[in-house]
Amino acid sequence: MKLNELYNNIGAKKRKKRIARGIGSGKGKTGGRGIKGQKSRSGVAIKGFEGGQTPIIKRLPKRGFNCISTKKYNIVNIYNIEVALADGRLSVADIITKEKLIEAGVVNNKNNKKLVKLLSLCSDDFATPLSLKLDAYSSKAKDFIEQAGGKLL
């Protein structure tokens, strides 16, 4: 016996049955889907349906709620203002407001309805006196601005 004379035993490799390929194929016409209805159509899946068992969405408890009155802030660090000042997008002489930050590209314009809060992340040698008129400030940010000789309006 040589390598080119090897072959599988009869019935060792069974071809899989191709579904919905003619009536004579044994799985033709409806292709095991039954007759009519949502589940017989192509591309249809019932979202969240798990075959009759209680879906995970119903098994898990409801938790929490979305408070309507929470204030949503755009967060700006002192460092972001420092970079904008260095690039010339903001001026030290001007009062820095929400609108000026949007023009300078520090705050995203899409979130124009949100309030602006200043946080204290800045370089160690921050000493620029700034005049700011924003919606909120962290306590550390207030300290940094006041130590540098700035004003919060």
From Swiss-Prot:
GO terms for molecular function: rRNA binding; structural constituent of ribosome. GO terms for biological process: translation. Residues 23-35 have a biased composition (Gly residues). Residues 21-40 are annotated as: Disordered. Transmembrane segments: none annotated. Pfam families: Ribosomal_L27A. Keywords: Ribonucleoprotein, Ribosomal protein, RNA-binding, rRNA-binding. It comes from the Bacteria. GO terms for cellular component: large ribosomal subunit. Coiled coil: none annotated. InterPro entries: Ribosomal_uL15 (IPR030878), Ribosomal_uL15/eL18 (IPR021131), Ribosomal_uL15/eL18_sf (IPR036227), Ribosomal_uL15_bac-type (IPR005749). Part of the 50S ribosomal subunit. Belongs to the universal ribosomal protein uL15 family. Binds to the 23S rRNA. This is Large ribosomal subunit protein uL15. It comes from Rickettsia canadensis (strain McKiel). The lineage of its organism: Bacteria, Pseudomonadati, Pseudomonadota, Alphaproteobacteria, Rickettsiales.
